[in-house]
Amino acid sequence: MTMHIRWRGMELPSSLEVDRDSLTQTYGKFSAEPFERGFGASIGNSMRRVLLSSLVGSAVTQIKIRGAQHEFTTIPGVLEDVTDIVLNVKSLIVNSNTDSTRVITVERNTAGVVTGADVQTDADVEIINKDHVICTLTDDVPFMMEMVVETGRGYVPSTEHSSVDHEIGIIPIDAVFSPIVRVRYEVEATRVGQKTNYDRLNLEIWTDGTINPEMALTEAAKILRKHLNPFVQYRELGPSIFSAARGGAGSPEAQLEAKLNMTLADLRLSVRANNCLESENIMTVRDLVQRTEDSLLEVRNFGDTTLNEVREKLSQYGLHLGMRVPNQPLF
């Protein structure tokens, strides 16, 4: 039996249903109910727009091919011209676990099809569609290409990657950073008691494989919530009520609470650090500072480099790991 929540006379959904039978790394179907009439479309449309435009992803932004001065040329021994190679590289699905720019390469000397599996990457970069064709060598000729991988949001045209004084031979390309391929939502009627004028929201998400649909949905909801926070009055009323008992909004207690209530996004950590912490359900600075260094090092993919990054970020706010603080906000 579904549990319902009422708030100020309005029906609210209590949980999100996930279709586990169809859930994969690239597809997910989610449902939530009941919404008051009209809220299903409002939430569904907002989530769809955020999913398609605002999630962070990785893409190749520039390439450099040995022997090619610009994209309107051909390379001896290569079936495709450079323009076709650029189009193929645009469809290469790249997953980067770092915010910094990375350079990946392709080197081949024998005839045959060059695919994503031939790309040489480092530990922070992964090629998802390894069977994707980049080009075809018709002869045993040396082929060398460098690709610049960056992180970003949405679609960024090649003109924003290029500069007047860029090195000859560097070819900027359009970058599709969004890891979301498609989003579809529908609203249908649902029942609460004897009333049937409520909404049920069904949301389907297709990704490129660099992020799973559940994580994508969570990230989109966080982004939407962060943009709505300034409109929520209790964010301003809370510190005033707290300061009346503690001696002012500028008191040390109030300042500490403000820092502890920050989210991980406020710390501007790297993608790797964020993913590691969120996998442990660490969502706020309050959650983070209560963890010890040893416990964090036990988290998968959380190494000394990431630990030093977290230490440095916390120290900027006068905080450190292993602190003893209240588990719940004081206001």
UniProtKB/Swiss-Prot annotation:
Q: Which Gene3D superfamilies match?
A: 5' to 3' exonuclease, C-terminal subdomain, DNA-directed RNA polymerase, insert domain, RNA polymerase, RBP11-like subunit
Q: Name one GO biological process term.
A: DNA-templated transcription
Q: Which domain of life is it from?
A: Bacteria
Single GO cellular component term: DNA-directed RNA polymerase complex
Class of this enzyme: transferase
GO MF terms, alphabetically ordered? DNA binding; DNA-directed RNA polymerase activity; protein dimerization activity
Which UniProt keywords are listed?
DNA-directed RNA polymerase, Nucleotidyltransferase, Transcription, Transferase
Region annotated Alpha C-terminal domain (alpha-CTD), chain positions = 255-331
Its biological purpose = DNA-dependent RNA polymerase catalyzes the transcription of DNA into RNA using the four ribonucleoside triphosphates as substrates.
Provide the family line: Belongs to the RNA polymerase alpha chain family.
Protein's name in the database: DNA-directed RNA polymerase subunit alpha
Provide the taxonomic classification: Bacteria, Pseudomonadati, Planctomycetota, Planctomycetia, Pirellulales
